């Protein structure tokens, strides 16, 4: 039996996060699984869990890796067993499920969203996979609706723009776009050109070059129909809208997009997504991040996680570069501040527990 209480990072009454050693360990029922956390990663979303997004007492954190400690009675479909090394992304700071979050000694997840960590990857590398590959999968194959997928590639090698290719979501997107049979066209600073090429980018452009959009249009014969914006600012949206070909297309961001920019091209369909939508449950965060329960999203989540399992099993995807720190949950608080201050560049910040 596991202990009754645990240490975790939880929301405070004044909209912050603190370390607590008297938190409840998640109760395991149905198809849920209890995991002893071994490593966690800090993501930009963690920096946004402040103020009205904080539920007092709710556990924070999204990305984790660990060892299966207990399996619910109905968790029988995905061959998850006690002792398995697993990772995934869950929804931390969840007012509807406050005992579950990544930044804790123990966490829980439904069995279908768990990924088994292959032998060639460490817990620290596993902890970096969840948000990056789940969010980009949702963006590319649900929101943008790319024909084909990494297990059944498209027959036409269309160009797909990945803006911000050297980010963690960018390198994940480049790999998935290429595996799905498309040509990943990406942007980053020149110092990261070789990095994004190593992940499969077919062409790379310096977003600071004044001729960048013209060069992309020339390279793609003005035929980009799909754009994933991994940076998701007004400026990056304007860039993507200008780079999309004359026939229009689809644009997906990872944050709410500018309605003013959206109005500049009626032939481009904009959207923005959040990774937790794949759970299919209500996201009870303040507007504009509130979402109703959506069974169709949940079905996509089951489908996409199964795709990711096969990609991992066959060593077809690899994680973003990571920087590993020790010090446990107490140091995660410092890590959140470092991400907020943009002190970490080009790598995912991971902590061992």
From Swiss-Prot:
Substrate binds at residues 131-138, 275-279. GO terms for molecular function: nucleotide binding; oxidoreductase activity, acting on NAD(P)H. Keywords: NADP, Nucleotide-binding, Oxidoreductase. NADP(+) binds at residues 45-48, 166-169, 189-192, 207, 254-255, 344-345. InterPro entries: ADH-like_C, ADH-like_N, GroES-like_sf, NAD(P)-bd_dom_sf, PKS_ER, Trans-enoyl_RdTase-like. SUPFAM superfamilies: GroES-like, NAD(P)-binding Rossmann-fold domains. Pathway: Mycotoxin biosynthesis. It comes from the Eukaryota. Its EC number is 1.-.-.-. Disruption phenotype: Results in the loss of production of equisetin and fusarisetin A. It catalyses: L-serine + 7 malonyl-CoA + acetyl-CoA + 2 S-adenosyl-L-methionine + ATP + 8 NADPH + 11 H(+) = (5S)-3-[(2E,6R,8E,10E,12E)-2,6-dimethyltetradeca-2,8,10,12-tetraenoyl]-5-(hydroxymethyl)pyrrolidine-2,4-dione + AMP + 2 S-adenosyl-L-homocysteine + 7 CO2 + diphosphate + 8 NADP(+) + 8 CoA + 6 H2O. Belongs to the zinc-containing alcohol dehydrogenase family. Trans-enoyl reductase; part of the gene cluster that mediates the biosynthesis of HIV-1 integrase inhibitor equisetin and of fusarisetin A, both trans-fused decalin-containing tetramic acids showing also antimicrobial activity. The PKS module of fsa1 together with the enoylreductase fsa3 catalyze the formation of the polyketide unit which is then conjugated to L-serine by the condensation domain of the fsa1 NRPS module. Activity of the Dieckmann cyclase domain (RED) results in release of the Dieckmann product intermediate. This is Trans-enoyl reductase fsa3. It comes from Fusarium sp. (strain FN080326).
């Amino acid at each position: 039996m596991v202990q009754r209480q645990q240490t975790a990072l939880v929301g405070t009454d004044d909209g912050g996060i603190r370390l607590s050693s008297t938190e409840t360990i998640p109760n395991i029922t149905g198809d849920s699984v209890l995991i002893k956390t071994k490593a966690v990663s800090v993501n930009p979303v963690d920096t946004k869990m402040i103020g009205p997004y904080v539920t007092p007492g709710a556990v924070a954190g999204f990305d984790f890796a660990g060892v299966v400690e207990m399996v619910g009675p109905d968790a029988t479909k995905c061959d998850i067993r006690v002792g398995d090394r697993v990772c995934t992304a869950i929804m931390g700071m969840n007012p509807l499920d406050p005992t579950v979050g990544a930044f804790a000694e123990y966490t829980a997840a439904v069995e279908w969203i768990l990924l088994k960590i292959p032998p060639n990857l460490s817990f620290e590398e596993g902890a970096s996979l969840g948000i990056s590959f789940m969010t980009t999968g949702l963006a590319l194959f649900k929101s943008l609706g790319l024909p084909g997928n990494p297990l059944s590639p498209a027959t036409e090698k269309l160009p797909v723009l990945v803006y911000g290719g050297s980010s963690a979501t960018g390198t994940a997107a480049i790999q998935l776009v290429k595996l799905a049979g498309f040509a990943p066209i990406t942007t980053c600073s020149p110092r990261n050109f070789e990095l994004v090429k190593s992940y499969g980018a077919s062409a790379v452009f310096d977003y600071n070059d004044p001729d960048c959009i013209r060069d992309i249009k020339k390279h793609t014969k003005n035929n980009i129909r799909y754009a994933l914006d991994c940076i998701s600012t007004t400026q990056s949206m304007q860039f993507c809208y200008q780079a999309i070909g004359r026939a229009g297309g689809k644009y997906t961001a990872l944050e709410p997009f500018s309605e003013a920019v959206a109005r500049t091209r009626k032939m481009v369909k904009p959207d923005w997504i959040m990774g937790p939508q794949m759970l299919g449950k209500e996201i009870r965060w303040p507007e504009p991040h509130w979402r109703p329960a959506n069974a169709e999203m949940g079905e996509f989540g089951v489908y996409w996680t199964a795709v990711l399992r096969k990609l991992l099993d066959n060593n077809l995807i690899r994680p973003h570069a990571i920087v590993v720190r020790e010090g446990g949950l107490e140091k995660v608080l410092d890590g959140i501040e470092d991400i907020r201050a943009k002190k970490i560049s080009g790598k995912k910040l991971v902590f061992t527990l």
